């Protein structure tokens, strides 16, 4: 039997906690036998003293085990259970293509996603732009969809990693969110509860990233890869660029539209293509569906070219109570904004920098995201035809097309877009979409 205050004291004094001590504390968070003050105190001691790798693995596993851990063995699936997690960005719609692409190549993707957080868009919010789409199927239905379709994208239920929910809520109000061991535990507890064979992490870098510097993004990626592999799940991470909006659009319905166009081949933004393919390649290799990069890319390109990936997306939408002809008739179903018109720069030049975070917040301000949990989302608003770094901007090439609910909202968004995009008289050096791959 342990005492919570003695565990806090031990960590406060700079000592490593045992697996048993960590499990006792996490189970107490779940069972409400540990107070909010005690959670806050432990979070702050971890913030200042960090955690060893064994402590990090124990924390993650204890949070994972605080609720249900999905088990797929009884379904006798003929492929690996794989997923990816992104630290979030703007125009980051990769999940909507990646899940169907990997499923079309023989993987099973039980993706448990989140809502928008701060300036970042949420996969669940995007999917809810599709009429009828059900993000909370019951457990049996979720398993059926995975078995029949190969991919489902759902919201986190209360049975998955419940200790994390309470731990995170306390961290959020005690300035202890940005601790690498605590971020790692929070992300992986939910992902590992999916019962995965393999995981790829997409850790964003740049002005729209969660972590403020490249070094911190790299440290987070290394921590997640180390802990997940320590927990027995084959995991790699990619550091990808978020110094500009990833897709050509940012919003909810507008990003779903771009995802369908990507899958059908109607339009593929080159940077979005690079990042999506790179993440899918990691999933196929880690899931042992391909032996190397070349084989993985060939398989993925084939399911895009032969329409199989688009077909899987359509089947997922239908299985989750969306329209059965969504891929063929997406424009009929997706909401459109009252006002859509282009915004132009006041001067000419090349785009040298972009405050991606500010662009994400502009979408939120238009109603495309939540400032508080009770807010309702306007799925129709957002940006399309986003200009990219290095683009030559003049009276012919707009910075973006803004989709707004009225003129006043459009004007406010136009001001934000102009302020967020910096022009220079010469083009900047091009930056890669994927900076590096982390395997340990």
Curated annotation (Swiss-Prot):
Keyword entries, A-Z: Glycosyltransferase, Transferase
GN (gene name): deoA
Function: The enzymes which catalyze the reversible phosphorolysis of pyrimidine nucleosides are involved in the degradation of these compounds and in their utilization as carbon and energy sources, or in the rescue of pyrimidine bases for nucleotide synthesis.
Reactions it catalyzes: thymidine + phosphate = 2-deoxy-alpha-D-ribose 1-phosphate + thymine
HAMAP family according to UniProt: Thymid_phosp
Record SMART domains: PYNP_C
The protein's enzyme class: transferase
EC number: 2.4.2.4
Annotated Pfam families: Glycos_trans_3N (PF02885), Glycos_transf_3 (PF00591), PYNP_C (PF07831)
A GO cellular component annotation in the UniProt record: cytosol
UniProt-listed Gene3D superfamilies: Nucleoside phosphorylase/phosphoribosyltransferase catalytic domain, Pyrimidine nucleoside phosphorylase-like, C-terminal domain, Transferase, Pyrimidine Nucleoside Phosphorylase, Chain C
Associated pathway: Pyrimidine metabolism; dTMP biosynthesis via salvage pathway; dTMP from thymine: step 1/2
Family: Belongs to the thymidine/pyrimidine-nucleoside phosphorylase family.
Alphabetized GO MF terms: 1,4-alpha-oligoglucan phosphorylase activity; thymidine phosphorylase activity
Summary of subunit composition and partner proteins: Homodimer.
Highest rank taxon of the organism: Bacteria
Protein name: Thymidine phosphorylase
Gene Ontology biological process terms in this record: pyrimidine nucleobase metabolic process; thymidine metabolic process
InterPro entries the record matches: Glycosyl_Trfase_fam3 (IPR000312), Glycosyl_Trfase_fam3_N_dom (IPR017459), Glycosyl_Trfase_fam3_N_dom_sf (IPR036320), Nuc_phospho_transferase (IPR035902), PYNP-like_C_sf (IPR036566), PYNP_C (IPR013102), Pyrmidine_PPas_bac/euk (IPR018090), Pyrmidine_PPase_CS (IPR017872)
Organism encoding this protein: Salmonella heidelberg (strain SL476)
């Amino acid at each position: 039997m342990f005492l919570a205050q003695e565990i806090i004291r031990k960590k406060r004094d700079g000592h490593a906690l045992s697996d048993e001590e960590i499990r006792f504390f996490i189970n107490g968070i779940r069972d409400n036998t540990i107070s909010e003050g005690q959670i806050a105190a432990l979070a702050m001691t971890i913030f200042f003293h960090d955690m060893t790798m064994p402590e990090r693995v124990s924390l993650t596993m204890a949070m994972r085990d605080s609720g249900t851990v999905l088990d797929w063995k009884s379904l006798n699936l003929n492929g690996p259970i794989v997923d990816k997690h992104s630290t979030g960005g703007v125009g980051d719609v990769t999940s909507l293509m990646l899940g169907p692409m990997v499923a079309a190549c023989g993987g099973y993707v039980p993706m448990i996603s989140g809502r928008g957080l701060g300036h970042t868009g949420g996969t669940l919010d995007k999917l809810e732009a599709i009429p009828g789409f059900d993000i909370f199927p019951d457990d049996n239905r979720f398993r059926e969809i995975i078995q029949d379709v190969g991919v489902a994208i759902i919201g986190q239920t209360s049975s998955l990693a419940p200790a994390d929910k309470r731990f995170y809520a306390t961290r959020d109000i005690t300035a202890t969110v940005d601790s690498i061991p605590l971020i790692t535990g929070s992300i992986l507890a939910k992902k590992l509860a999916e019962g995965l064979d393999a995981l790829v992490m997409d850790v964003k870098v740049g002005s729209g990233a969660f972590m403020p510097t490249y070094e911190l993004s790299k440290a987070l990626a290394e921590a997640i890869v180390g802990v997940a592999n320590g927990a027995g799940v084959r995991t790699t991470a990619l550091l990808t660029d978020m110094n500009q909006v990833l897709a050509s659009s940012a919003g909810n319905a507008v990003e779903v539209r771009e995802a369908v166009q990507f899958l059908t081949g109607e339009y593929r933004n080159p940077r979005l293509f690079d990042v999506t393919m790179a993440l899918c390649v990691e999933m196929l290799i880690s899931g042992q569906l391909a032996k190397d990069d070349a084989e993985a890319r060939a398989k993925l390109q084939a399911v895009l070219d032969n329409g199989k990936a688009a077909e899987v997306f359509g089947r997922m939408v239908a299985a989750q109570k969306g329209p059965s002809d969504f891929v063929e008739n997406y424009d009929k179903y997706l909401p459109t904004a009252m006002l859509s018109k282009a915004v132009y720069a006041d001067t000419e030049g090349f785009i040298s920098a972009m405050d991606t975070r500010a662009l994400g917040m502009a979408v939120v301000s238009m109603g495309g995201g939540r400032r508080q949990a009770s807010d309702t989302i306007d799925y129709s608003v957002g940006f399309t035809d986003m200009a990219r770094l290095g683009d030559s901007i003049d009276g012919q090439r707009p910075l973006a097309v803004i989709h707004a609910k009225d003129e006043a909202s459009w004007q406010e968004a136009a001001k934000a877009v102009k302020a967020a995009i910096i022009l220079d008289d010469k083009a900047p050096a091009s930056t890669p979409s994927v900076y590096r791959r982390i395997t340990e």
